[in-house]
Amino acid sequence: MPVHPELEGYFLATGFADLLPLALKMAQRDGYGPEEMIEAICMVADKAKTYPPTRNRVAWFATVFREKLRQARAQMKAYERKTRG
């Protein structure tokens, strides 16, 4: 999956730039797009402020990012349905 122009910036800004390759693999495997990834990384950053990873940062990120990808897709689909009427 080619890196979306803004995606790397979001990962840099949130402090998870080193985990971008893992995030790309996860998203590609599960069929998520760049917009969903951007939304998810923002939600991961919010969660990290409240519940920062304390032991295994990579495992924490993988678990939370997968959860937030699903949440981002659901929110985007709900918004799409709402705006279509």
Predicted feature locations:
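Short cationic/low-complexity microdomains
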Residues: 32-44
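Generic structural signal of hydrophobic/aromatic residues within well-ordered alpha-helices
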Residues: 7, 22-26, 37, 69-72, ...
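Non-catalytic, well-ordered alpha-helical scaffold segments
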Residues: 5, 20-21, 35-38, 55-63
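Long, charged low-complexity interaction segments
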Residues: 1-32, 84
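Short, cationic/aromatic linear interface patches
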Residues: 41-85
